[in-house]
């Protein structure tokens, strides 16, 4: 063999070796070096981070009857264990996303090869992508860093670096978790569309059921949506979603998880949804949920935040004594961080009863949408400057409208964008497309109107609030802050303070009973005059003229809400004593201690009033309203428990006498509609209230098992009915209470019955029939008022 041939063979051998290193060895060495670099220098999650992955878990609010009424969340996600997920979901995910899930250790090189050769070259995507479920989990739990820039090829270098990090993280996940734990974490972490993160939120949003209850076609529908949550959203694109669902079902059959007959049956089934998007504006008890968030997030009170010293002092005491108030700022996690309602997956056990809450919301809606709003809308048609009455002057009207414009979102946005006052105000006169609240099935209507007209329209919508408390515990069972949380965020239960009218009178009668008087004590029905700063004031009489000068009982006085009798009692005890009684019964808002307090000018909240009236069926014991019983972390560890604070405000004798007095209101007075229209039987006490110009309508009533109160009025006090027959508390507020109680009494799951009774104190033997006066207490309300009892109510001057 010639030297030339030998030299050529040697060169060929060297070239082969070089090309071997170029094509095979160098990539292997490079990949190995890259992996080592990633492990050594990249920010790979630590063991502790792998044990406690950073996953945004929704906080759940769980009702007293065990229903999750809503969540606080950035991502609507609630973790469920592997055992609580239907096998159909597991099989659908594995068959579609990672067919060799149980055969690899985090990275499936066989699948990677398939992606390179079969999927890319042969365009066969039936076996999915190259990323394993574990890699997808790593990408979800530990988000990718931003790509590098600044040099040629930086994007590709970054992507390789990131992919290597995902590989290493996936392998570490496989070493720390079982396959069951990994697939459960994956299903709990991914986004399914419609705001649903995690399989629990998805199954509840699309089907209204638990993950363990999902059948083959439901599981396939949800898993299929993961690829493109909007495109394959069954509520938005049912045809595309069904095509994708059927593909997933085919993959399940191909993998051997279901039979061919099951496949055909599932693919032939229609899509059946029980679709309900869970957001902060919808769902049960939205005003209550918002109140809980604010209560738990509150900061320590500062004097500069309060107009009145006594309200600042009350909240300062509450900060020290009420563990729920500012809980998030008073407590920390074991690592020293503050708890986060939107991320930490807390379980907050609230006192709301889901059934009572639903009945309360339905009662408010029925009264406003079917009765009051149509009447008010009809009355507004004849008004010069609706929704305000005709006696409003132009200056006041313009002031109210200007104030409303400055409080609007449109005005705030304009100021933020640097527009002048003139430019912003000009926008309010230009018609634009908008969506506004409406009493229809959708809860809104799309229309075109000027922002000025939209302000007037929104002000014309009557507002209402409702709260119910269980007497024996003080636990709040129902809470409705307004007609629609989405459009009217203002909470009229705890935020709104309105004049209480004649619902204040029971405090004065309570003082009289506590001081030794009885319901049957007799007084002369005469106007009373007070001297105030060298001036005189006489409360306007609400009684028929031919009843003036007659002897009546105190029970008659409260039954018919006589201003004369209330003024008589105020003369006996004085405003300071009445104010002290109100404080003892839980009234914390600021009010003036003046003689006119006896007829109701004080601005108080519905929450305060209901809690105070709850003292009567509670045998004289006042209880602060309780909203939350305990808080747990996501693993069920108890973080806090809350018990109510009970104080004896009045004697059980006084409480029972007040029950007797207020039963007269229901049986023969301004609350008689509960008997003759709503056919409510059993023992009920209560009091109506109406303020000047019919601006506010009140009713607070109680049975032995439930105390509930209602307020109805306009956003502005000047928005009101013209006629007392329509704007009284007995016409506006009392029907909500009646509808609510009817629903509760029909529910066999609620411990409320018309057979419930108020128990007299042991040893009490007092005749409360109250006969012998010039006018009998049991006189028919129609005769007393000279009109039907449905038409009017008491009012103050």
Where are these regions (language model features)?
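Peptidoglycan glycan-strand catalytic modules in the bacterial/periplasmic cell-wall system
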Residues: 56-58, 62-265, 269-319, 327, ...
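Short, well-structured active-site flanking segments
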Residues: 102-112, 197-200, 259-264, 513-534, ...
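Active-site SXXK
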Residues: 93-94, 247, 252, 360, ...
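Active-site-adjacent helix/loop patches that line small-molecule binding or acyl-intermediate pockets
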Residues: 132-133, 140-147, 152-159, 352, ...
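A penicillin-recognizing enzyme superfamily signal
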Residues: 286, 350, 354-370, 403-470, ...
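Non-catalytic structural connector segments
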Residues: 259-419
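Short, glycine/proline-biased beta-turn/loop segments that scaffold the active-site neighborhood
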Residues: 270, 495-551, 624-639
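N-terminal type II signal-anchor transmembrane helix
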Residues: 2-62, 100, 120, 371
């Amino acid at each position: 063999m010639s030297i030339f041939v030998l030299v050529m063979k040697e060169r060929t051998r060297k070239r082969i070796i070089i090309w071997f290193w170029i094509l095979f060895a160098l990539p292997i060495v490079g990949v190995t070096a890259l992996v080592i670099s990633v492990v050594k220098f990249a920010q790979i999650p630590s063991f502790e981070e792998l044990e406690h992955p950073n996953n945004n878990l929704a906080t759940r609010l769980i009702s007293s009857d065990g229903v999750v009424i809503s969540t606080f969340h950035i991502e609507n996600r609630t973790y469920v264990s592997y055992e609580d997920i239907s096998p159909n979901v597991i099989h659908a995910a594995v068959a579609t996303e990672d067919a060799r899930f149980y055969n690899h250790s985090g990275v499936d090189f066989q699948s990677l090869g398939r992606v390179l050769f079969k999927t890319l070259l042969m365009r066969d995507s039936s076996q999915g992508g190259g990323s394993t479920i574990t890699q997808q989990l790593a990408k979800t739990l530990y988000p990718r860093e931003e790509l590098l820039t600044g040099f040629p090829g930086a994007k590709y270098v970054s992507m390789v670096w990131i992919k290597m990090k995902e590989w290493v993280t996936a392998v570490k996940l496989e070493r720390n978790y079982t396959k069951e734990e990994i697939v459960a974490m994956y299903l709990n972490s991914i986004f399914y569309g419609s705001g649903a993160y995690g399989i629990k939120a998805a199954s509840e949003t699309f089907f209204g059921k638990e993950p363990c209850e999902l059948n083959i076609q439901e599981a396939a529908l949800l898993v299929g949506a993961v690829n493109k949550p909007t495109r394959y959203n069954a509520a938005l694109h049912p045809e595309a979603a069904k095509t994708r669902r059927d593909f997933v079902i085919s993959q399940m059959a191909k993998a051997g998880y279901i039979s061919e007959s099951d496949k055909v049956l599932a693919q032939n089934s229609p899509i059946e949804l029980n679709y309900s998007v869970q957001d902060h504006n919808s769902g049960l008890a939205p005003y209550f949920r918002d109140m809980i968030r604010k209560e738990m997030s509150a900061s320590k009170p500062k004097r500069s935040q309060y107009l009145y010293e006594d309200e600042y002092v009350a909240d300062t005491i509450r900060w020290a004594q009420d563990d729920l108030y500012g809980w998030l700022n008073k407590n920390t996690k074991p690592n020293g961080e503050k708890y986060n309602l939107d991320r930490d997956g807390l379980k907050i056990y609230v006192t709301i009863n889901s059934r009572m809450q639903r009945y309360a919301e339905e009662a408010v809606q029925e009264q406003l949408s079917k009765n009051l709003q149509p009447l008010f809308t009809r009355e507004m048609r004849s008004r010069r400057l609706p929704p305000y009455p005709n006696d409003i002057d132009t200056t006041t009207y313009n002031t109210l409208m200007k104030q409303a414009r400055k409080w609007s979102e449109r005005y705030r946005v304009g100021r933020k964008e640097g527009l002048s006052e003139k430019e912003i105000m000009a926008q309010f006169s230009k018609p634009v497309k908008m969506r506004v609240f409406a009493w229809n099935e959708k809860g809104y209507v799309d229309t075109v109107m000027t922002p000025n007209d939209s302000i007037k329209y929104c002000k014309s919508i009557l507002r209402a609030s409702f709260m119910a408390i269980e007497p024996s515990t003080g636990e709040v069972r129902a809470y409705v802050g307004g007609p629609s949380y989405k459009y009217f965020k203002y909470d009229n239960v705890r935020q709104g303070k309105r004049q209480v009218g004649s619902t204040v009178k029971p405090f004065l009668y309570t003082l009289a009973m506590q001081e030794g008087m009885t319901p049957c004590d007799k007084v002369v029905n005469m106007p009373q005059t007070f001297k105030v700063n060298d001036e005189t004031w006489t409360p306007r009489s609400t009684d028929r003229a031919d009843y003036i000068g007659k002897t009546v009982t105190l029970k008659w006085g409260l039954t018919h809400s006589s201003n004369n009798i209330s003024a008589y009692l105020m003369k006996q005890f004085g405003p300071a004593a009445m104010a002290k009684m109100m404080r003892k019964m839980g009234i914390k808002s600021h009010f003036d201690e003046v003689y006119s307090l006896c007829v109701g000018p004080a601005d108080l909240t519905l929450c305060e009033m209901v809690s105070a009236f709850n003292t009567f069926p509670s045998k004289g014991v006042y209880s602060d309203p309780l909203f939350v019983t305990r808080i747990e972390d996501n693993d069920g560890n108890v973080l806090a428990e809350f018990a109510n604070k009970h104080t004896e405000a009045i004697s059980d004798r006084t409480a029972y006498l007040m029950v007797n007095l207020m039963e007269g209101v229901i049986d023969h007075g301004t609350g008689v509609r509960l008997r003759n229209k709503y056919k409510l039987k059993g023992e009920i006490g209560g009091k109506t209230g109406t303020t000047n110009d019919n601006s506010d309508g009140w009713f607070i009533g109680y049975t032995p098992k439930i105390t509930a109160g209602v307020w109805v009025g306009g956003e502005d006090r000047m928005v009101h009915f013209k006629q007392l027959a329509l704007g009284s508390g007995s016409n506006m507020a009392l029907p909500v209470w009646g509808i609510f109680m009817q629903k509760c009494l029909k529910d066999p799951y609620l411990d409320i019955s018309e057979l419930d009774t108020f128990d007299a104190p042991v040893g009490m033997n007092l005749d409360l029939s109250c006969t012998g006066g010039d006018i009998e207490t049991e006189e028919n309300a129609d005769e007393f008022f000279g009109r039907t009892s449905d038409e009017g109510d008491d009012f103050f001057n």
